[in-house]
């Protein structure tokens, strides 16, 4: 049997070869003969079966795999006749990897052969030629698009997550298949060079990589394999067999110099305008080059593009997805969330000197940090497409040599800040293998003065707790406290104020009888403050660790940061605030509410600092510059609810960065001081605030850069949302100096 892509065709049950193998002649010896056609996860999409019986009519059947083996309900009877052309579209990838053909239900002799084709057009040309030769009267049986994946019904949770990933990928690739191709503007014949360092790669890895490259449906690309002096006979034999293969360029280095050196050797041979780097066990996703080319054509200003990832096992079965946020320079200091598939401009790579030696295990991270320096964020694009498959196995480099890779990553991060003239140390994050940048402060007197603004009325237990926490459990050396009181009458509270005013310099209680309006309270506090920056603090908050305020203030060292939010927990140690997603529920909402306090979230992002569009006003630091630029809080439209979202979105649209940090962690006994918004006048007021938020910020259509468009927006714990359209490339958002 002739195959362009390797097929494992098993003659099972009641079948014997008849005559010479090249004749493809078989004899059925019973009433249930069948062939099982097995194809790989990555394959050519069109399978054509030629079936012919000269001496009598036969009654073939096709069995289509739907996830539970081949059963009678999967059978598709075909017409009765003597000659058949059976066509099946199995797609370019999938985890359903078999088709069964029963040639007849009785003893007979017949010819059976199978071909695969890269597309429908090539298949039709081959069918026409075959019909002209000897199958003019063949019955055409088109099985259509076969299921690529198993149905997601009644699966346990782990298998469901894997199946969701597969279905998500399938939907993206089907949408991309119908996409017309547009080549990006380029002065070079090759617009994209893919460079892969190789060392002792198994043959099947190289086969998968090459097949995934060949399956791309756009011209103008090259694949460069740079071998790091492999010793494996299997790898070397694979090279020898492809010595004359003009589809790939193989660079065979004579000495083993490591990944960085081998990659640089490959980069020196690249001729494309753009360059992508992959590992030898990676796979290029279906239609990836076409989707990327279209994006580059639409964004000629782009200087860097990165994509999402499909996580697969050793046999390429989908296990999960890595859906990334839009570019986040703060998150990047904690983890290389960008990784692959990333596109660099070749001329800039040449200018910075390619990869540096000495960063083994994190050489890509170091390259990324160096490459992105000085590039405006408006030229850094995130393409939400699963453009490559990361084969995650026990032998993955970053797992096998994790200590070396972690140390190299921290050295690269420290070096990145040093080049900008900022001294930092890099410590473990809440996940030990991830990273936390700590900015150096030479003297305690160098910390800027912070004006802490606390709205309050009565509530002795709450206000006494937070004031005690500030003065006794907070190690920040330079702050004042302004309690903005809208009419306390409790003698204990008034006495507490008087005591603090006598004993704590910088403490003031500004009392004015009026209806509670959070925005007005904040405006009063900021007007009367004397600090360099402003910290808004609810009265129902408790300090957990003493360094929380230093952490929040230190985040202002990140470029253009205007607002910083903290990690807040309910009293039962579950998450109350890990950042606000604009558009969640059509308005804005906290993501991952009620998760355990140590919950890491997607890509462990909740263990790291993140750029957000919004954070809660319960614990919110505002830089003086941002406060002056954005102006007053909106006392008319947002008296109690959503005022923090409105203020953050105004700052975000003005180009200020908003950071959420998990390293400042406090308890928040939410709304104990003002009650519920679910009934009476409070509900009427809250409904008006919702309408104001929609009207002023169009939150229903807001694309929050912190949330990948592959996640649903209907609930706090967002799951995968099967796409109906391909999401466009995304930017972080409005920019100041960025």
Describe each model-derived feature in a short phrase.
Residues 134-188, 402-450, 572, 584-611, ...:
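C-terminal, non-catalytic tails of nucleotide-sugar-dependent glycosyltransferases
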Residues 254-261, 267, 360-361, 513-520, ...:
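A short, glycine-/small-residue-rich helix N-cap motif at loop->alpha-helix starts
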Residues 287-319, 377, 541-587:
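Conserved donor NDP-sugar-binding/catalytic core segment of glycosyltransferases
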């Amino acid at each position: 049997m002739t195959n362009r892509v390797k097929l494992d065709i098993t003659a099972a049950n009641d079948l014997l070869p008849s005559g010479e193998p090249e004749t493809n002649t078989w004899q059925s010896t019973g009433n249930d003969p069948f062939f099982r056609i097995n194809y790989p996860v990555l394959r050519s999409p069109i399978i054509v079966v030629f079936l012919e019986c000269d001496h009598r009519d036969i009654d073939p059947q096709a069995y289509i795999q739907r996830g539970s083996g081949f059963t009678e309900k999967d059978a598709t009877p075909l017409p009765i006749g003597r000659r058949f052309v059976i066509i099946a579209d199995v797609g370019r990838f999938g985890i359903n990897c078999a088709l069964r053909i029963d040639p007849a239900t009785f003893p007979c002799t017949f010819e059976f052969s199978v071909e695969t084709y890269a597309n429908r057009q090539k298949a039709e040309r081959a069918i026409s030629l075959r019909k002209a030769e000897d199958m003019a009267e063949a019955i055409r049986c088109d099985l259509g698009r076969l299921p690529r994946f198993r149905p997601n019904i009644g699966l346990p949770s782990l298998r469901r997550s894997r199946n969701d990933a597969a279905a998500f990928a399938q939907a993206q690739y089907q949408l991309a298949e119908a996409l017309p191709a547009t080549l990006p503007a380029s002065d070079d014949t090759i617009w994209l060079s893919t460079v892969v360092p190789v060392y002792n790669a198994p043959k099947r890895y190289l086969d998968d990589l090459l097949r995934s490259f060949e399956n791309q449906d756009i011209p103008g690309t090259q694949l460069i394999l740079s071998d790091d002096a492999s010793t494996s006979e299997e790898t070397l034999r694979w090279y020898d067999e492809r010595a004359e293969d003009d589809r790939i360029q193989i660079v065979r280095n004579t000495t083993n110099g490591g990944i960085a050196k081998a990659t640089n050797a490959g980069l020196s041979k690249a001729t494309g305008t753009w360059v992508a780097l992959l590992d030898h066990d990676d796979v290029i996703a279906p239609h990836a080059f076409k989707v990327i080319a279209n994006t580059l054509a639409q964004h000629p200003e782009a200087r860097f593009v990165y994509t999402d990832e499909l996580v697969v096992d050793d046999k390429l079965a989908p296990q999960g997805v890595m859906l990334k946020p839009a570019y986040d320079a703060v998150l990047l200091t904690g983890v290389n969330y960008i990784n692959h598939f990333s596109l660099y401009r070749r001329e800039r790579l040449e200018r910075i000197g390619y990869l540096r030696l000495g960063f083994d295990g994190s050489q890509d991270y170091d390259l990324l940090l160096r490459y992105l320096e000085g590039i405006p964020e408006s030229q850094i694009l995130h393409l939400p497409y699963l453009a490559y498959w990361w084969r995650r196995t026990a032998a993955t480099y970053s797992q096998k040599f994790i200590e070396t890779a972690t140390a190299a990553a921290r050295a690269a991060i420290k070096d990145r800040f040093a080049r900008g003239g900022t001294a930092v140390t890099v410590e473990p994050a809440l996940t030990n293998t991830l990273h936390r940048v700590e900015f150096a402060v030479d003297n305690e007197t160098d910390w800027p003065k912070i004006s802490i603004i606390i709205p309050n009325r009565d509530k002795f237990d709450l206000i006494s707790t937070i004031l005690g926490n500030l003065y006794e459990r907070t190690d920040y050396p330079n702050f004042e406290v302004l309690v903005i009181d809208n009419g306390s009458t409790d003698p204990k509270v008034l006495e507490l104020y008087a005591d603090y005013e006598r004993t704590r310099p910088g403490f003031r209680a500004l009392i004015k009888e009026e209806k509670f309006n959070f925005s007005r309270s904040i405006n009063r506090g900021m007007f009367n403050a004397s600090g360099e920056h402003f910290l808004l603090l609810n009265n129902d908050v408790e300090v957990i660790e003493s360094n929380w305020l230093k952490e929040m203030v230190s985040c202002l060292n990140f470029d253009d940061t205007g607002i910083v939010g903290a990690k807040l927990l309910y009293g039962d140690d579950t998450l109350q605030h890990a950042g606000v997603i604009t558009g969640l529920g059509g308005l804005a909402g906290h993501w991952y509410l009620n998760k355990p306090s140590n919950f890491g979230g997607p890509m462990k992002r909740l263990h790291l600092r993140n750029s957000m569009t919004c954070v809660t006003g319960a614990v919110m630091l505002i830089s003086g510059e941002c406060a002056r630029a954005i102006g007053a809080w909106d006392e008319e439209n947002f008296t109690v609810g959503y005022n923090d979202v409105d203020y953050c979105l105004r700052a975000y649209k003005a180009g200020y960065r908003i950071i959420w940090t998990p390293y400042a962690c406090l308890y928040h006994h939410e709304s104990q001081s003002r009650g519920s918004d679910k009934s009476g006048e409070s509900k009427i007021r809250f409904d008006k605030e919702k309408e104001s938020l929609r009207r002023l910020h169009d939150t229903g259509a807001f694309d929050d850069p912190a949330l990948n468009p592959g996640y649903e927006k209907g609930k706090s714990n967002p799951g995968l949302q099967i796409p109906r359209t391909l999401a466009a490339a995304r930017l972080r958002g409005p920019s100041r100096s960025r």
